[in-house]
Amino acid sequence: MDKLKIEASEALAGNVVISGAKNAALPILMAGVLAETDFVVTNVPNLRDVNTSCELLRCLGAEVTRSDNSEVRISTSSLDHFCAPYDLVKTMRASILILGPLLARFGTADVSLPGGCAIGARPVNLHLHGLEQMGAKIEVEEGYIKARVDGRLKGAHIFMDMVSVGATENLLMAATLADGETIIENAAREPEVIDLANCLIAMGAKIEGAGTDSIRIQGVESLNGCHYRVMPDRIETGSFLIAAAVTRGKIRCVDADPSTLEAVLAKLEDAGATITTGSDWIELDMQGKRPKAVNIKTVPYPGFPTDMQAQFCLLNVLAEGTSTITETIFENRFMHVPELIRMGANMELEGNTCIIQGIERLNGAQVMATDLRASASLVIAGLVAEGTTIVDRIYHLDRGYEHIEDKFKGLGGQVVRVS
């Protein structure tokens, strides 16, 4: 099993090209099931979860081809299977997003209950309840969600009990081919939801309000394929900015979108970083400065993202002062804390809050990645730790970061993949 070996590195410097957003690419690939003609998606990152999504589409009978330049072409003319099996779904929670498109276009879907990062319950009941309101008949048996609808789904006024990105995306896709109008209230406002909606609109869908908490969809008879470019990955961008901040370096993230990172950039400025932005780049300068501690509370977009919590934990570990980080989105999302403590961090947990006293330096250690974003924080920790750090179980990392060791090397980081 691969590991990353990391040595203490100098201040990061240079440019890093940001990949397409995993959390936008996955639902957009699933939306290919809705298209009656060929569908081409570009700026698709080369990640484990993306490969799993492509394999899932092939398992359903779709023709999926991937070129070397981050382009995926999908044809559903031969799609004739409607079951997403356990062996594929167990490795990736986003597989649940195939449910809405299959049901909307073909009237039937059997989807294994999903897997993915072990960071809390994250139940699928919001997905199922919304589809039931649209006329679907759903049973959960033998580990599978079995959904059927006679004819087409029907438009509905859906009130989400809580904000859920995945449920918003699933219901949004399903509603595009439903009879009549669907309104999703308390919808997720994340940029990835907007990106999916823009893709669906390019396919012929009628959608208003994406990016607000009320999305209105007028169902259409059919959707066609299109050419669509996936948005930049805001979490990858934020992760590299954190790495530059803790190494007291200066980097520029190119092919980035600063408008999707306002809460993160504001906190980095509070920590003492100088931030400069253009339409498609972000520059961070922390040369010669130690970060200042910043308090964080994760909330749904446009607030501070839960996917940046682990990285800011690390920043605060090395910052001047005491800080608190409160996690309100997911349970069990402080599994990186014991690993950082192994490296010398001064941290303690009280319920869903982590209290951190900043220290000058970490020590290299053998640590274990527990989920996608936690693994990123451990890799960055290795860049500033004295000695050698080994990060095990980096298959988590490969689910969400494209060529991370090569990108760090390009900035001066000493990171190598070993078996």
Swiss-Prot record:
Gene: murA
Keywords tagged on the record: Cell cycle, Cell division, Cell shape, Cell wall biogenesis/degradation, Cytoplasm, Peptidoglycan synthesis, Pyruvate, Transferase
Class of enzymatic activity (EC top level): transferase
Stored Gene3D superfamilies: Enolpyruvate transferase domain
Active site: 117
HAMAP family: MurA
Gene Ontology CC annotation, any one: cytoplasm
Domain of life of the organism encoding this protein: Bacteria
Catalytic activity: phosphoenolpyruvate + UDP-N-acetyl-alpha-D-glucosamine = UDP-N-acetyl-3-O-(1-carboxyvinyl)-alpha-D-glucosamine + phosphate
Protein name (database record): UDP-N-acetylglucosamine 1-carboxyvinyltransferase
Residues bound to UDP-N-acetyl-alpha-D-glucosamine: 93, 307, 329
Pathway where this protein functions: Cell wall biogenesis; peptidoglycan biosynthesis
Molecular function terms, GO-annotated: UDP-N-acetylglucosamine 1-carboxyvinyltransferase activity
Similarity section: Belongs to the EPSP synthase family. MurA subfamily.
Entries under Pfam families matching the protein: EPSP_synthase
Location of 2-(S-cysteinyl)pyruvic acid O-phosphothioketal modifications: 117
EC number: 2.5.1.7
Residue sites binding phosphoenolpyruvate per the record: 22-23
Cellular compartment(s): Cytoplasm
Function: Cell wall formation. Adds enolpyruvyl to UDP-N-acetylglucosamine.
